[in-house]
Amino acid sequence: MVWALGLMSGTSLDGVDAALIETDGVRIGRIGPSLTVPYSPELRGRTRELLDRAAGLAPDDAEVLAVTRELTLRHVDAVRLLREKAPGLEPAVIGFHGQTILHQPERGRSWQIGDARLLQDLCGVPVVHDFRSRDLENGGEGAPLVPVFHAALLHQEVRPVAVLNIGGVANVTVLGQQEPNGQRGVWACDTGPGNALLDDWALQHTGQPCDFGGALAASGAVHQDVLERLLAIPYFARPMPKSLDRLSFHPEAMACVRDLSAADGAATLASFTVEAVAGTTFPVRPEGWFVAGGGRHNPVLMDGLNHRLGNVASVDVLGWDGDALEAQCFGLLAMRFLRGLPSSWPGTTGVRQPCIAGRAV
């Protein structure tokens, strides 16, 4: 096994997560340290503006190029700081996801900005990037890619279980009952909104980047009629696998809640996230749910999930770092690329056949 360094900047647009894991691409050995380099308010704002306009932008747009460079330099900072934090754990490879500004699987397109060559040149470590393109080219959704990592972490768990990641978008990995030969089914999809709608609502009404501790949602009431309109969006009737962009049905959802008070809107949007998960049909019924991502810190979401699903806990009870999982995942995916191992399957992304993810610089 070798040390791999994974980098992830998610749809919450809060910064760059960097993490070290020891892996051969199949097994996970030691879990190294991790850290987050936050985006400045200015960089977050510029990135959000690109995200809002991405469908009409060209890769050589001046602002795209400028933000790409700034984001890449934040990733360089993250690598430098993590190497300083763990001087004896030198990475053999970096898995670089980049910042998603557009995800349109129905058009075969997913756009992550970031300069992999600049990152490799400044860090002096081989970089693997562009993890979604090949899956899309082979009929897949290009997301989610984390199931192979969840399966590796839970290789000793024999029950059917689910790992729910609540970032800007919520995605779930469902692992079937483990057979005596060690084989098990793996399925995945984006269930619906995670924190993105709540974050945008909180920013609009309180000036804060998120609903800290779920306080705003906890003080409000769910408007059932509005919730029913939100859940009638056609995406929720589609079978898995399926995936979303951060702004999928964003205007429609915000229009539904615009006349509500700040507290009631937050409560209704939180319930939207919960009900989208609870309403997703899986091939097997999970006996346990483990929640990762920023959403696990929101008591309103966690209480709602426990009420609807039962047996829901934070991944922290497993000893995992729920804020570093996706960064750790891209360390594993980079090693799988180097070994020629697939990272997506028909049950996880809808790809036609098992597919290797990534590309070397």
UniProtKB/Swiss-Prot annotation:
Q: A Gene Ontology molecular-function term? A: kinase activity
- Give the matching PANTHER family: ANHYDRO-N-ACETYLMURAMIC ACID KINASE
- Tell me the residue numbers annotated for binding ATP: G10, T11, S12, L13, D14, G15, V16, D17
Query: Source species, please?
Result: Gluconobacter oxydans (strain 621H) (Gluconobacter suboxydans)
Q: What pathway does the annotation place this protein in? A: Amino-sugar metabolism; 1,6-anhydro-N-acetylmuramate degradation; Cell wall biogenesis; peptidoglycan recycling
Annotated protein name in UniProt: Anhydro-N-acetylmuramic acid kinase
Gene3D superfamilies assigned to the protein according to its UniProt record, in alphabetical order: 3.30.420.40
Give the encoding gene's name: anmK
State which Enzyme Commission number(s) the record gives.
Answer: 2.7.1.170
Spell out the family assignment given in the record's similarity comment.
Belongs to the anhydro-N-acetylmuramic acid kinase family.
> Which reaction equation describes what this protein catalyses?
1,6-anhydro-N-acetyl-beta-muramate + ATP + H2O = N-acetyl-D-muramate 6-phosphate + ADP + H(+)
Primary role: Catalyzes the specific phosphorylation of 1,6-anhydro-N-acetylmuramic acid (anhMurNAc) with the simultaneous cleavage of the 1,6-anhydro ring, generating MurNAc-6-P. Is required for the utilization of anhMurNAc either imported from the medium or derived from its own cell wall murein, and thus plays a role in cell wall recycling.
> What domain of life is recorded for the organism?
Bacteria
What's an example GO BP annotation here?
Answer: amino sugar metabolic process
> Keywords of this protein's UniProt record, alphabetized?
ATP-binding, Carbohydrate metabolism, Kinase, Nucleotide-binding, Transferase
